[in-house]
Amino acid sequence: MTSAVLRRQRRATFTVFLANGCGIGGWAAAIPELKRDLALGDGQLSLVLLAVALGAMLTMPFAGVLVPRLGGTGRLTRCSILAFVLVLSWPGAAPSLAWLLPCALLLGACNGLIDVAMNAHASDVESRWDGPLMSSFHAAFSLGGFLGAGLGALVLHLGASAFAVLLTAALVALVLALPAALALDEGDRSPVSHALRLPDRRVLALGLIALGCLMLEGAMTDWSAVYLDQVGGATPVVATLGYAAFSLTMLIGRLFGDGVRRRFGGPQVIFGGALLATLGLAVAVLLPAPWTAILGFALVGLGLSNVVPAAFSAAGQVAETPATGIAMTATAGYLGFLLGPPLIGAVAGQVGLRGSLLLLTLIGVAVALLALRQRKT
């Protein structure tokens, strides 16, 4: 493959991550307004988020089967990103919880496919590239999240509904995704279903690190705006800035992530990042006023920025094959991203949102301890 063609694949993959992040950012911005429009309680909202998680878990096991059937990771990425964009606005049009739950289930199903597909394709592109790329791809996702949340804040400022927020995010994501999806090559044709096999202890530890990290990231995606709204007393527009700050600092961290990992090493990056994220959560819990909580969420984003890329890179080195290790770690991390928000909602129903964030600090400490163990092995 010529360098020009490979650069084109890198740009296309980068843009797919960007489009997916934009959609997720729009979803994060729309959640408080959706909760308010349908008069949902914390427990009911946790059911909606659980439906998103369940939808993804139903489709993830089939990703490996679809790769060879569709002709490669690139083709699966193409189909799944377009499906994700198509259904993104549907939850905003739901007139009741009974309609919202199946829409959320379908959104989760499509997002589960695109998350597995684009990470598998990113791994294939990285294997053909001279140097690490994973942090830059995840930086694109963070940039998209910042873009989607920012657009959501603007639309809400104009007095629009949750449906308008999601539709705007979907249209922007479509403009980004369509040319990128058409530019993707076939990619790796081998199935990734072997990612569900029992991993060795090193890959298992990296999977747990990714699970904990993405559980925190999922909580920031789905609950940061709600926390600022209910606990901090922020206006709807200011409430969206929590996720925007989180995404912005995560983007900044990932832009420098490959160089930081080359200098300090993956385990050190994971350890320091987990501690910084824990500090940010503590700030948000102890100082819940809107601007101090937003500062805390920004620290969480900076801390988590390179944990997952570092875990993916390490898993690719210690597993039997790079694709196997990355797929195992990505699957564990994705489960954390999906299951974290409904878990936080369930805990919030018992002890409140501040208690839920306090629980997340323990997860941050656990990730740091796992990274410390990785440094010794």
Where are these regions (language model features)?
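Helix-breaking motifs and short loop linkers at transmembrane-helix boundaries and internal kinks
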Residues: 39, 71, 93-95, 233, ...
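Interfacial helix-cap and linker-helix signal at transmembrane-aqueous boundaries
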Residues: 34-35, 66-67, 154-159, 228-229, ...
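Intracellular juxtamembrane helix-capping segments at the cytosolic ends
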Residues: 112-127, 305-319
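Short amphipathic helix-loop junctions that connect adjacent transmembrane helices
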Residues: 29-43, 222-238
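Helix-to-loop junctions at the C-terminal end of transmembrane segments
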Residues: 59-72, 156, 253-265, 348
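Helix-loop junctions at membrane interfaces in 12-TM secondary transporters
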Residues: 92-103, 286-295
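Helix-loop-helix hairpin linking two adjacent transmembrane segments in secondary transporters
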Residues: 137-185
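Structural signature of the two symmetry-related core transmembrane helices
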Residues: 75-89, 98, 268-283
